[in-house]
Amino acid sequence: MTTRYTRSGVRMRLHSQREGILNWLLLPGGPGIGSESLQELADAMAVPGAIWLVDLPGDGSNLAGEGSDPFAAWPQVLLEAAEALPDVIYAGHSTGGMYLLSTPALHGRIRGLALLDTAPDCSWHPEYVAMTQRDPLPAFDRAVAAYEADPTLQHLTTLVVASAEWNFEPAALAAGRELLGRMPYNGAAIAWSDAHFDHLYCAQWWPTDIPVLRLWGDNDRIVSQQAWQAPQYATDNVVARAIPGAGHFPWIENPAAVRAAFADFTVRILG
């Protein structure tokens, strides 16, 4: 797999390449889950050009060097990846989309923006907490207690896998657990975002001069889509697609619908 790094350590790994000039940069959610979580999304996308899996420095398996502070330039360091390649379309899942909307310097540097199961502000978080209280998962609660007592990678992985019923529809639970079980979790990235971003976030820009794809699973229980009802986000450049029968990773339950949405988005980009 071809791998490139920006000067600050943003990692871009080439997933696939078809004929065409576009460069698709896929940014994972979490944070701390790693771009490996978007492998199935990249597999589902039948788009022209190159698809790259992107990890911020210190996120997922993109580990920082000893003594460095990989989070010092989060999330603005995303600009470096956009400047490293021509004809870039950024796609951010969940918190990844929030990081993109917190980086106004991207304006004028990208040809399109895909926002996948994400939100324009942090109002999604109390709604998520309320959902977990309405529909508790005892195994998740036990895993949280174990991780807090002993914050190992094994305990963190167990915790996330125990949340699968919130993330996936029943028919996709086996695939969802397998996905969550093989991710390179990064506790430091999770802790940084919780302390410095997740509870303060509000979008710092909204592009109106490039195509925007807003895509979400119609049964996503993790990130509420309610805040998108604000009129400033109902601009003519937006392609909005609810993916039927899908949760927080809609390409797992319904890859065909996700593929079709990206095909329509590509038509908008290429004119």
Label for each model-derived stretch:
Residues L113-Y147, I190:
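Flexible "cap/lid" loop of the alpha/beta hydrolase fold
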Residues W52, L56-A91, T95, A260:
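Active-site loop/oxyanion-hole signature of alpha/beta-hydrolase fold enzymes
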